[in-house]
Amino acid sequence: ITMKAKQIALILIPLNIILAYFVYNSINSEVEFQQVAKVRVAENVQKLKDLRQVQIAYKKVNNTYSNNFESLIDFLENDSMAIVKAIGETPDSLTDAQALELGIISRDTAYVLAKETVFDEAYLSSRNEKFPLDLSALTTVPHSDQNYSVDAGMVEKGKVVVQVFEISTTYGAVFTGLDAENKSFELGNLLKV
């Protein structure tokens, strides 16, 4: 082997090592991003489900969905919901009103704080336990200083006007602090319920 071949080999060996590092690092950073992204999306989906739960309860009490978080949080913190305890069974031959009048059944209504009713034991047991429920940060997108967007209105479906709501955020807000450029997510797209 000539002297020139040795010099070229000495230059190419470190160059190959550097290139191998960059290839490994680019693959590894994508894998790490996907792992973190999966957790962040799951966390936001859980918070969106929590907010949906509040909206549904809000509508039960107020007959409409809220289009702002102030009224939703105020409802959750300060309002109460009726819990009806039914005692007895209505016979098939009678309506509830008739059975109630005859004393066959009875109804007892109690009022409980909205947050205790909305986030009852049944709901809490169905939540993803990796992400604890924090009412003080319910409207904030995790890992960012941004809030979710909320909107409510009416939509006509098959000649029937239906009340609807949407709570959303962008993937850009979900991935705050991560290098999400050129990844498999469109940062402007919405994650919503």
Task: Tell where the protein language model's regions lie, with residue ranges.
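Low-complexity, acidic interaction segments enriched in glycine
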Residues: 60-193
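Amphipathic alpha-helical segments typified by the pilin-like N-terminal helix
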Residues: 22-46
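N-terminal alpha-helical signal peptides/signal-anchor transmembrane segments
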Residues: 41-62
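N-terminal alpha-helical membrane-insertion module
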Residues: 5-8, 29-34, 51-53
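Hydrophobic membrane-insertion alpha-helices, especially the h-region
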Residues: 6-26
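A generic short-segment signal for beta-strand/edge and adjacent turn/coil regions
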Residues: 18-20, 41, 131-132
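Short, Lys/Arg-enriched N-terminal segments with co-localized hydrophobic residues
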Residues: 1-2
